[in-house]
């Protein structure tokens, strides 16, 4: 099923497409990592990318963000061709990311990490409101705002990574494996917050190994295998797809 046909459960079919990839190819050296990826994300959606390790999920996010240059194809964001845009310019255009492994600044405090998230912002007057928003989403970060990032628990570091990305005021927030290494209770908390962030108006592109949790949160999903999209549909329909249930849901 094509991306244009798959409709999500919350009726975003008529929302504008904010992110579109068309026949995108990218490489690690001579390794052809993405082999003609085409997908779209509409404003207000949560869209998830599913697949086994090495399928190309993280590579897709890296290519969108300009950390890995697309050799072929086109990437459009908010109506603008960003295929060749340098990675450092993506943040100011509205693309935020909490990367795999969190990558917080371990020797900086929680507050300093958040300040780094807002460093490139031109509207400095809006920063206090965004600190407040992050602390409302993650009260534990406010309790630990003077603590060094490296001393936080895994769950707290994930909260900080997401909070730092939110300080850029992204139109689209890309999350790479937010549940990695977390207890089931913390995973539920993180995903509840992800849905809160989405309800507040941020579009989300999610990579997540916990396929059931991802599909429960998402509107639509894409299944990747060896650098290609092999299936896309509404999240509810993917959950009942026999192949998805057998391969990714352990049924």
Task: Label each residue range with its predicted role.
Residues 2-251:
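Glycine-rich phosphate-binding loops of nucleotide-dependent enzymes
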């Amino acid at each position: 099923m094509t991306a244009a046909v798959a409709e999500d459960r919350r009726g975003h079919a008529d929302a504008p497409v904010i992110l579109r990839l068309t026949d995108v190819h990218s490489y690690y050296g001579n390794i052809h990592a993405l082999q003609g990826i085409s997908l779209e994300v509409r404003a207000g959606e949560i869209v998830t990318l599913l697949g086994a390790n090495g399928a190309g999920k993280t590579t897709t996010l890296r290519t969108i963000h300009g950390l890995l240059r697309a050799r072929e194809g086109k990437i459009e964001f908010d109506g603008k061709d960003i295929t060749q845009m340098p990675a450092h310019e993506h943040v100011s255009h509205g693309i935020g990311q909490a990367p795999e492994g969190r990558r917080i600044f371990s020797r900086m405090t929680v507050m300093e990490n958040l300040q780094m998230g807002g460093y490139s912002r031109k509207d400095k007057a809006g920063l206090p409101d965004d600190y407040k928003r992050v602390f409302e989403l993650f009260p534990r970060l406010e309790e630990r705002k003077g603590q060094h990032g490296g001393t936080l628990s895994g769950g707290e570091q994930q909260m900080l990574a997401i909070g730092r990305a939110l300080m850029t005021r992204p139109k689209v927030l890309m999350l790479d494996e937010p549940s990695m290494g977390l207890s089931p209770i913390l995973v539920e908390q993180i995903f509840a917050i992800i849905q809160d962030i989405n309800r507040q108006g941020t579009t989300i592109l999610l990579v997540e190994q916990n396929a059931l949790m991802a599909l429960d949160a998402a509107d639509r999903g894409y299944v990747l295998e060896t650098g290609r999209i092999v299936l896309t549909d509404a999240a509810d329909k993917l959950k009942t797809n026999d192949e998805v249930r057998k391969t990714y849901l352990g049924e």
